């Protein structure tokens, strides 16, 4: 179901301490919070943003459909989506 560039996966492991394997496991085990259209469809037509929960923090995983597979492009933590979906930083 998922595919990715192994070089990018190694870079994510080194720089962000997360892997596409872990992301796929999280998605398959119910950790997917939302799927959004990429806000810049002109530059990234058809690309989606998968919002996932990693240890209580929202991560954004840009992805695109390739046939019957989903290509994971990168992953990064997002304060904006953590606040929106997980309520971190709420004073109430």
Q: How would you describe each model-predicted region?
A:
Residues 1-92:
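Ribonuclease/tRNase effector modules and their secretory precursors
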